A protein has these predicted regions:
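Divalent metal-dependent phosphate-bond-processing catalytic cores, especially two-metal-ion Mg2+/Mn2+ enzymes
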Residues: 40-47, 69-74, 78, 82, ...
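Acidic/histidine metal-binding catalytic segments
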Residues: 92-103, 143-162, 176-183
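Short, Lys/Arg-enriched N-terminal segments with co-localized hydrophobic residues
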Residues: 15, 19-38
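An active-site-proximal "capping" alpha-helix that borders the catalytic cofactor pocket
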Residues: 79-87, 128-141
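His-Asp-centered metal-binding catalytic motifs of divalent-metal-dependent phosphohydrolases/nucleases
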Residues: 98-125, 133, 137, 156-167
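Active-site flanking loop/helix segments enriched in acidic
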Residues: 53-79, 111-123
């Protein structure tokens, strides 16, 4: 099955459909047509994502894949797709929402590539990549049609992408749109755990690990950490401020399932330990932050909220 269909999702759905057909054919009282229609719809969903992925790969040909920052964002995109699927399935979401989460993950950072091409930077001051990406997809040219032919979810996808990097998620009243806006934000942060461990520090922050650890944590940055809040970009002064802000952002997680994955991989402690902190005071603060955050995560997991 895998050799024939080149996709685990499609192979499983085809195989299950085969079993279902055999079962209903031997059970005349079953609604064979209804069950087969459902299986066909599930297969269509995986085909939709495969088509979107192929279109995304074609879009990437407009950029220099050999560029370290471009490469980082390509890997991050597919990491977010996997993270979104993992979280969604742990939450028990239906297959349509799982596939929708994957499509949003695929397109969430589409604005980043132009930002890197123009400015060679991830800094929010150079471009609001989320708003730019939403405009790119849903503006007059309707680039979204390259990736998703069905327009039923346009508003949901646009809102989720546009708000995925907002400091705080606000202003969404539709329940399903809010679900996916929260889900992409969690998936984005979850894969950023991997990024902070695997990518070179020079690509991330322009200096090596020692250079990151030489700074002093700014008072406003530490206040945000102790308030269990994300750090404002404008409050960051030194490279160590950036590094600690990457950890503090994990207070802004929506679903306990995301925290479960983070704890399984021991992400917070591993990210903190990547940098050698020159000042004892900085090391002490990082230890405090890691301990408090892990306690907070465990409480959210226990309470399932």
């Amino acid at each position: 099955w895998l050799r024939k269909y080149n996709s685990l999702d499609k192979a499983l759905i085809i195989y299950v459909k085969y079993i279902v057909v055999v079962f209903v054919q031997s059970s005349p009282n079953r609604n064979k047509e209804g069950i087969i229609i459902i299986m066909d719809e599930l297969l269509d969903l995986t085909r939709d994502f495969d088509a979107a992925k192929a279109a995304f790969e074609a879009y990437l040909d407009e950029y220099d894949r050999a560029d370290d920052k471009i490469h980082l964002k390509i890997e991050h995109t597919y990491g977010v797709v996997d993270a979104a699927e993992d979280i969604a399935r742990r939450m028990g979401l239906g297959e349509e929402d799982v596939q929708l989460a994957k499509v949003i993950g695929l397109l969430h950072d589409i604005g980043r590539f132009e930002q890197i091409k123009r400015f060679d930077s991830f800094e929010p001051g150079t471009m609001e990549h989320a708003a730019y990406g939403a405009q790119l997809l849903f503006g007059p040219e309707k680039m979204i049609r390259r990736f998703v032919k069905d327009d039923r979810f346009d508003s949901l996808i646009c809102t989720a992408i546009e708000k995925h990097s907002d400091f705080k998620l606000e202003g969404i009243t539709d329940e399903r749109t809010l679900l996916h806006a929260k889900l992409i934000r969690d998936a984005d942060k979850l894969d950023n755990c991997r990024v902070k461990l695997e990518e070179s520090m020079e690509t991330l922050l322009g200096v090596d690990e020692k250079g990151v650890g030489e700074g002093v944590i700014a008072p406003k940055v530490w206040e945000s950490c102790m308030a269990k809040e994300s750090v404002l970009s404008s409050d960051r002064v030194s490279k160590v401020d950036y590094w600690i802000s990457y950890i503090a952002q994990y207070y802004d997680i929506n679903f306990p399932e995301t925290y479960e994955i983070m704890r399984e991989h021991d992400y917070v402690k591993r990210i903190m330990d990547r940098v050698p902190y020159a000042l004892p005071e900085t090391q002490e603060k990082m230890d405090i932050l890691a301990a408090e955050m892990e306690e907070y995560m465990d409480e959210r997991i226990r309470n399932k909220k």
